[in-house]
Amino acid sequence: LLSLHDFLILHPKIAIFDLKIVRFNKQYNMKRVLGLGNALTDILLQVSEGDLREIGFPKGSMNLIDAEKFEQLQARFISVRKHLVAGGSASNTVSTIAQLGGKAAFIGKIGCDEVGNFYREDLMKNNVTPLLLTSSLMSGCCIVLITPDGERTFCTYLGAAADLHAKDIRKEAFVGYDICHVEGYLVQDHELIETALRTAKEQGCTVSLDLASYNVVNENHQFLKDLIYKYVDIVFANEDESFAYTHLNPEEAVENIAEQCDIAVVKVGKRGSYVRQGNQLHHIGAITSNCLDSTGAGDLYAGGFLHALSDGFDLRRCGEIGTIAAGRVVEIVGTKLPEETWDEIRRICALYRGFMHKLKF
């Protein structure tokens, strides 16, 4: 595990650039990224192991619930302090890209209600272009149960988010974007996710897919394999998801997945991550973090990685930027990093960019 200070020491050629001199330019020319996923507002609750056992959901799982179960959980934890943030996996990823200065947009569906308005405003606040459709259903919400070890268990009422269908996917929405990042949770609707991936590919996008959750992979194993083989260029998975997909250990899993797409990423928590493309294999160590809540860690890793990739960084640098973003978000409750933390990551991106520019000239 590396502290950020140690990280820069291990990169002396980069560290020679004075952080006070290098300035981040939001107009820097880079590829545009489009996210597609469930538009969900997260309700974050810190609970005990006993609370989680009583509810009966496996720790670390993603569980779809109906409106009745949603109301029951709300009532069960009525006295617990709640923290609301606009979330959803792909939305978190593109928000990260936008915060780091990238150009990003998000496609999802919300209700015509206060929660939906909050969601739209939050995207714009984070410099993400909202390409949102509306539904007569209530906006989707996700109750995130966070145990003392920082692990999170999702109880998701999709609501309007689940009202996004294949017929809503228009090729015009993909025009002008270079990368399309899709969350694996959409695999619950086979027609929707296949239409989205196929349309993105037809419009010339590099297609990125996050495998979402091990139980989603288990329930849709062969369908996911077919999707990846036909449409996907970049796959993100954590250790549990990669095992569900390949039944292999992480190092073997990243090799197996990379045989089916262009770039494979397997995240292994405190042990860092593996990134593979062809014969290139990189192991990126984690940075030192005081883990409070792992919500969004994988999403921010993907955001940091894709931002760096869109900026022309090599694979190791992409993994390092993803690692730093993930390492910082686990230190807070929720997924919204404070501005000073974003500034820290932006400066590192600028250092890398300045170093690459110096190498060229």
Residue ranges and their predicted role:
Residues 98, 197-201, 258:
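Surface-exposed amphipathic alpha-helices with a cationic face
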Residues 131-134, 144-187:
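Conserved phosphate-binding/catalytic loop of the ribokinase/pfkB sugar-kinase fold
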Residues 26-105, 361:
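Glycine-rich phosphate/adenosyl-contacting loop at the front of the ribokinase-like
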Residues 69-141, 348-351:
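Substrate-binding N-lobe of the ribokinase-like
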Residues 203-206, 211-283:
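Conserved phosphate/ATP/ADP-binding segment of small-molecule kinases
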Residues 7-12, 17-19:
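Short hydrophobic targeting helices and cationic amphipathic motifs
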Residues 31-40, 46, 53-59, 64, ...:
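Conserved phosphate-binding/catalytic region of the ribokinase-like
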